[in-house]
């Protein structure tokens, strides 16, 4: 079965920290995201999932495809195979629009902001570190 998903790498422009949720099933820290609903565009799903999983509203950062419908290009598309099928994830860099109290969704056990250095001390997939480095360098002019 094919699963189309969208996720947001939410980075605070002031602190350069990333917002991650600790996924209940995976028992790892991951970026907020989830399945794209029928009749929903990937960028809409990324915004919706971020709000559902964290309680904050976001603005996607990305190149806008020059068309009437104002399509935002994803930073990348991640693909992997699992027991439930093929997962295709549209990845978007984002910034928070509000910093109200974070909420933990039923799919997570924890939520938090992490610096790049802190990612070395928590259980994350290597892709999260690589993607955060890319976003910091290309969207926030952070040089390692």
Q: Which residue stretches match the model-derived regions?
A:
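NUDIX/MutT-family hydrolases
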Residues: 91-93, 102-132
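Active-site segment of metal-dependent pyrophosphate-handling enzymes
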Residues: 55-100
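Short connector loops at helix/strand junctions that flank enzyme active sites
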Residues: 1-5, 24, 31, 83-89
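Conserved Nudix-box catalytic region and its N-terminal flanking loop in Nudix hydrolases
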Residues: 16-59, 65
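Conserved N-terminal beta-strand and adjoining loop/helix that marks the start
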Residues: 1-17
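Compositionally biased, intrinsically disordered linkers/stalks adjacent to structured regions
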Residues: 133-144
């Amino acid at each position: 079965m094919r699963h189309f998903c969208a996720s947001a790498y939410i980075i605070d422009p002031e602190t350069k920290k990333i917002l991650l949720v600790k996924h209940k099933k995976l028992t790892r820290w991951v970026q907020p995201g989830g399945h794209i609903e029928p009749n929903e565009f990937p960028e809409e799903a990324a915004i919706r999932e971020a709000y559902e999983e964290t309680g904050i509203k976001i603005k996607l950062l990305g190149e806008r495809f020059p068309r009437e419908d104002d399509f935002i290009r994803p930073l990348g598309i991640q693909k992997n195979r699992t027991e439930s099928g093929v997962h295709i994830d549209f990845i978007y860099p984002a910034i928070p629009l509000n910093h109200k109290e974070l909420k933990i969704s039923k799919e997570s056990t924890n939520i938090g902001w992490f610096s790049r250095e802190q990612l070395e001390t928590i259980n994350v997939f290597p892709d999260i570190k690589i993607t955060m480095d890319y976003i910091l360098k290309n969207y926030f002019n952070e040089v390692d």
